[in-house]
């Protein structure tokens, strides 16, 4: 009489089945004849499609137990082989069928602390030196760019200051010209018959000279001639 009680496999068991480290460091062999022979002892539930492995069940042809609900084909095969080796090992030995998939020890992982030797060591050393030089050059370039930007900002500030100073000088010259014209009109009104020379046109200012000194002297000379 076949039993319909399914074989329960927890998530922890599935993780251990899928993790070689949990099995004593043994790596599973690739899918081959032994795996296909293990599947020969089971038949799938016809009510479920083959690709929906999480909801399908495989029924053992020897005892009727059901194994299933696993996410991938490899874990399914491991569970089937484990069931055969745990429950039907005598039958498998008699029929000379493999009781479990062929396993081989996993190669040890490369040690991260293993020292490099020979050409590889020299190559690593050269790469480290190049990386250090590149980092130093990048830092130096950043410093130079920052200094150049600071110099450009300072130059722009000086240009703005010179522009404002030139505008101020131009305004002063215009104001001085207006005052000269007003003074000439006042002198003509005070002495109608006197010959008052026209005020000269303003000369361009020389650097580092005070235009007020020359203007005051010319005004004093003009007033002196009129009084005489």
Swiss-Prot record:
A zinc finger (BED-type) spans 33-95. Residues 207-217 have a biased composition (Basic and acidic residues). Residues 132-185 form a coiled coil. Signal peptide: none annotated. Keywords: Coiled coil, Cytoplasm, Membrane, Metal-binding, Phosphoprotein, Secreted, Wnt signaling pathway, Zinc, Zinc-finger. GO terms for cellular component: cytoplasm; cytosol; extracellular space; membrane. Dual phosphorylation on serine and tyrosine residues of the cytoplasmic PPPSP motif by GSK3 and CK1 may be required for AXIN1-binding. The keyword Secreted applies. Acts as a positive regulator in the activation of the canonical Wnt/beta-catenin signaling pathway by stabilizing cytoplasmic beta-catenin. Involved in transcription activation of Wnt target gene expression. Plays a role in symmetric division of blastomeres in the early stages of embryogenesis via regulation of mitotic spindle central positioning and organization of the F-actin filament network. Plays a role in regulating the distribution of cellular organelles, via modulation of cytoskeletal dynamics and cytoplasmic lattice formation. This is Zinc finger BED domain-containing protein 3. It comes from Mus musculus.
